[in-house]
Amino acid sequence: MPPTVTAAEPVTTTGHVLPGEADYHALNAMLNLYDADGKIQFEKDREAAKQYFLQHVNQNTVFFHSQDEKLDYLIENEYYEREVLDQYSRDFIKSLLDRAYAKKFRFPTFLGAFKYYTSYTLKTFDGKRYLERFEDRVVMVALTLAAGDTELAEKLVDEIIDGRFQPATPTFLNSGKKQRGEPVSCFLLRIEDNMESIGRSINSALQLSKRGGGVALLLSNIREHGAPIKNIENQSSGVIPIMKLLEDSFSYANQLGARQGAGAVYLHAHHPDIYRFLDTKRENADEKIRIKTLSLGVVIPDITFELAKKNEDMYLFSPYDVERVYGVPFADVSVTEKYYEMVDDARIRKTKINAREFFQTLAELQFESGYPYIMFEDTVNRSNPIAGKITHSNLCSEILQVSTPSEFNDDLSYAKVGKDISCNLGSLNIAKAMDSPDFAQTIEVAIRALTAVSDQTHITSVPSIEQGNNDSHAIGLGQMNLHGYLARERIYYGSEEGIDFTNIYFYTVLFHALRASNKIAIERGTHFKGFEKSKYASGEFFDKYTDQVWEPKTDKVRRLFADADIHIPTQDDWKQLKESVQKHGIYNQNLQAVPPTGSISYINHSTSSIHPVASKIEIRKEGKIGRVYYPAPYMTNDNLDYYQDAYEIGYEKIIDTYAAATQHVDQGLSLTLFFKDTATTRDVNKAQIYAWRKGIKTLYYIRLRQMALEGTEVEGCVSCML
C-alpha cells in the first residue's frame, strides 16, 4: 500500500489554524511581550512549538501504516542508504525506533522545532513533505555511526535523544541519507609558494566546498607582491589575486551543496602583504581588491606583542627569501625564535611597519567588519602535544592541528602527499552531561561517535585530506550550554564559582576523552601515526596532572560534582592513565575543540558554545518566516539575574572563563569578544593583549552591540528592555 499524506499543500511556513487557535508564529512573537504582570511569557513559546506540530508538521508529514512499510519505501526510493541498514537485522532497527519513540521527545522551543524541520529532517525530493520525525533522524545517525555495533547504536540513541551529545550539523543532517554530503564540518589546506600548489588548492577548495564543508587555507608561504619570479624582480602579484580566485571558487561551489560555500584565509602578521591583506575588508576598499565573502585570519607570534610593548617597528620578511635561507616554508619557521637572526640576515628582504600601528589597524578593521580572526601562534604551538608545527586555524578558529606540505607535478598530480586537516565535530550539552546517569560513558560514546565520522570519511578527491584523516583519526569534541547550566545552578557567568566549574568540568572531560581514545587504541591494536613522537608518548603531557592536585576551589562546585555523582580524577587516576597511554597509545591524534555551535544549539536547547548569551531573548531572522524569538535555556521569571548578556559581562570574565577551559583542550575554542557601542579600538587592543597574556589560543569574531535604535524601543518589548 503506498504511503498517504494528510494534507495537499507543499511544506511552507504557513499552517492550518483552527478557529479560536493562535497561529504558532504569533504565539512565538508573544515571547517578546510582557504579560499584564510584567512577566516574560515563556509558556507562549512552548505553546508555539506545540501548535507548529498541530498546524504544520503533522499535516505535511507522509503517513505510513507501519515501520516496515516506511523503511521499505525509503530504501526502495533511494532516500535511505541501504548499506547502512543492511548492517542490522530489521527487528533490531524497529526495536531501536521503538526505543527512540519511547523517550517521548518534545522540542522545548519553537525555534528548535522550526530549525530541525527546515534544515535537518529528510524531505521528499520535491521538498514538499516531511519523511522523518526527530526520532527517525536520531536513529539513522546512530545506525550510521555505530556501523553494525548494536550496543553502540542503542547508547547513541540514548545520548542524542536525551540531549547529552549532539553531532555537528553535517553529521546530523547527512547520516544515513542516500543523497547526501559528507559528515565532516570543515577542512584546512596549505598552499605552498608555487603555481602547482596554488592551482591544486583552488581545485581542492571546489571539491571540498561541493561536499558541504567550510575550507580554510594558509597563504603565509606565498611570496609577496613584487617578489621575484625566476630571479626577475617585481614579478609576483602577492596574495590578493589568490584570495580573489578562492572567493569566486566558493561562490560557485555554493550552487552545488545544501550549505553555503564558505572559505577563510590565514596570513602571518610578518608577511609583507599583511596590510594589503587587511585592506581587502575595508568598507571603502577598491572593488579590484575588496573581499566580501572570505573570512580573514591573522597569525600573530609573541614577538609582535613584545615589539608593540616596546613601541618598536616590526619587520616583515619575504617568504620567498626565508624559504631559500632556511630550506622550509615561511609558515614552518618560528618567527619569534628567528626574528633577530632574520633581521640581521642580508639575504632576506624585509620591510618594516610600526608594531603598535599594526595592532591599531587590526582593531579598526574588527570594528568595521568583525574580522580578522586571530591565532596566537606561539601559545598554540607551546601547548600542542603533537610533533610538528600548527600554522593556521579554520573557519571558526577552533581547529588547531599539525599539517605538512604536499608536492605536485606539472600536471597537478601529487609528487608527495602531505597532511591536511578535516574537522570531525560534535558537542556535549554541559547541563545534560552533568545530569548523565554515567558521565564517563557519555564522553566515551561521544568519542566513539566522532571516531566513526573519521573512520567513515574518505575524501579521495583531495588526497592530502584523506591522508591526514587516515593518519590522525583527529576529532573535536565540543561543549555547549555552559551559561545555561551555570544560570540553572544559580552561578554567575565569569564569577569565581563559574570559572572554578569550567576548570574542573573540562579537566574531567579531558581525562575521560583520553581514556576512551586509549580504549579504542587497545581494542584496535593501533594508534595515530606519529604517536611515538608526541608528548603523550614521552609522558610530558601528563606532568601537569600527575605533579599537582586539581580539585574544586569552591564549596558550590565541589557539591555540584558530588550531587551529580561524578568522580573528579585524582593524581593516581592520571598516573594509571599515563601508564596505559604510554604502553598502548591513543587512537585519535586530537580529541577536543570547542566550536561556536549555531543551529545545533537551538535544536539541543543550549546556549551556544561556552560563551554567555548575547541576549536573554534572542531574535533571529529565519528565511521567509521572518523574526523568530528564542529564550535562553533554563530561564524563568525568577532567575533572570543570572542571564547577564555578553555585552554586560565584558571581555575579561569571558576570557577568564575560556582560559580555564583552554588549559585542558588540545585544540582551540571559538572565542567571540563582545563590546558595547561605546568601545574604542583601544578597548579591542586591550582585550587582545589580555587574551594573549591569559593563554588564549585564538580569537573569533568581534561583535559590537548596535545601539542605533536607542530611544525607539517598543514599550513593553522584552528583547529591547532586558
From Swiss-Prot:
Site (Important for electron transfer): 700-701
Disulfide bonds: 186-423
GO molecular function: ATP binding; ribonucleoside-diphosphate reductase activity, thioredoxin disulfide as acceptor
Site residues, Interacts with thioredoxin/glutaredoxin: 717, 720
SUPFAM superfamilies recorded: PFL-like glycyl radical enzymes, R1 subunit of ribonucleotide reductase, N-terminal domain
InterPro entries: NrdE_NrdA_C, RNR_1b_NrdE, RNR_lg_C, RNR_lsu_N, RNR_N, RNR_R1-su_N, Rrm1
Catalysed conversion reaction: a 2'-deoxyribonucleoside 5'-diphosphate + [thioredoxin]-disulfide + H2O = a ribonucleoside 5'-diphosphate + [thioredoxin]-dithiol
Source taxon at top rank: Bacteria
Coiled coil regions, renumbered to chain: none
Record-annotated active site: 394, 396, 398
Activity-regulation annotation: Under complex allosteric control mediated by deoxynucleoside triphosphates and ATP binding. The type of nucleotide bound at the specificity site determines substrate preference. It seems probable that ATP makes the enzyme reduce CDP and UDP, dGTP favors ADP reduction and dTTP favors GDP reduction.
Top EC class of this enzyme: oxidoreductase
Cross-link named Isoglutamyl lysine isopeptide (Lys-Gln) (interchain with Q-Cter in protein Pup), sites: 310
Positions marked as site (Important for hydrogen atom transfer): 186, 423
Entry keyword set: Allosteric enzyme, ATP-binding, Deoxyribonucleotide synthesis, Disulfide bond, Isopeptide bond, Nucleotide-binding, Oxidoreductase, Ubl conjugation
GO BP annotation list: deoxyribonucleotide biosynthetic process
Site (Allosteric effector binding): residue numbering on this chain: 193, 223
EC number(s) stated in the UniProt entry for this protein: 1.17.4.1
Residues that, per the record, bind substrate: 169, 185-186, 214, 394-398, 596-600
GO CC terms: ribonucleoside-diphosphate reductase complex
Further details from the record: Pupylation of this protein has been demonstrated, although it is unknown if the protein concerned is the product of this gene, of the identical gene MSMEG_2299 (AC P0CH00), or of both genes.
Family: Belongs to the ribonucleoside diphosphate reductase large chain family.
Record NCBIfam families: NrdE_NrdA, RNR_1b_NrdE
Purpose of the protein: Provides the precursors necessary for DNA synthesis. Catalyzes the biosynthesis of deoxyribonucleotides from the corresponding ribonucleotides.
Name the UniProt record assigns to this protein: Ribonucleoside-diphosphate reductase subunit alpha 1
Gene: nrdE1
